[in-house]
Amino acid sequence: MKISVLQMPVAIGAREINMAALRRMLEDAMADAPDIVVLPELWDIGFFPRPLEKYVDENGAKAKTLLSLLAKQYHVHIVGGSVAVKIGDYIANRCYVFDRNGDLVADYDKTHLFSPAKEDKFFRKGDHRAVFSLDGVKCAVAVCYDLRFPELFRRYALDDAAVIFLPSAWPTARIEHWATLSQARAVENQVFFVAVNGSGAFANGMPLGGRSAIIDPWGVRLAEADEREAILTAEIDLSVRDEIKRTIDVFHDRREELY
């Protein structure tokens, strides 16, 4: 299975510019014939313009229309990062996943909202996990700050997810946390971990740190970006996961009765 990551330049509050960047980068990425393409958090408007209500996507219609069209056009699975979606009287930081036919196969609302940036004052936290199959491979998704909560990823591992995607908007100031925790989640859960950041800046001017990476269950970075706009592509060998489970069977040895 081949995975491409789009470390997009995200313009604050400029949906049309960001959609154009997505189209351009996806077209370039398809030269490597990926099976799955993954986008960063809030790629549509950035993290996040004020007043947020002015920029939200009503029922996710704009994002879903574009992502479905592109998935079908290029016959590729798309893990659609996340977008700011207005649903009735609340706003969600939501990831949509589309299959090669352009059909919606999963959605996930960010579970842990970043209170230091007052994200919890503007968005509603999610209430479900998301596990889904792409080409017969069980996958899961989380978003950004979720990375700091290992319990979620262990639940995904217990759900037998082989690949976990993490669309994010992570700052340069804490980028070493990003690198360390992403690698740890891959190793401790014996999964392929696809961590996708943006490039550019937050609405407050703080720079995004980039460093998107595709990491195997041994913790090896199969591909990694710097802070600039980038397309990463790596082939993942799912037999590696089987190998590590045979070699170090942590799920057999864990003491669930104690924790």
Feature-to-residue mapping (PLM):
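Active-site-proximal beta-strand elements of phosphoester/diester hydrolases
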Residues: 1-14, 38, 94, 107, ...
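Hydrophobic residues at beta-strand termini and immediately following loops
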Residues: 6, 108, 132, 196, ...
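Cys-nucleophile CN-hydrolase/nitrilase-fold catalytic domain and related Cys-dependent amidase chemistry
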Residues: 15-101, 107, 171-191
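Short beta->alpha transition motifs characteristic of CBS
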Residues: 45, 52, 96, 108-114, ...
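CN hydrolase (nitrilase-like) catalytic-core segments centered on the catalytic cysteine
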Residues: 60-79, 148-232
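Short beta-strand scaffold segments in enzyme catalytic cores
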Residues: 80-82, 94-97, 130, 212-214, ...
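Active-site catalytic loop in hydrolytic enzyme cores
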Residues: 86-159, 172-180, 245-250
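A conserved C-terminal secondary-structure "cap"
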Residues: 242-259
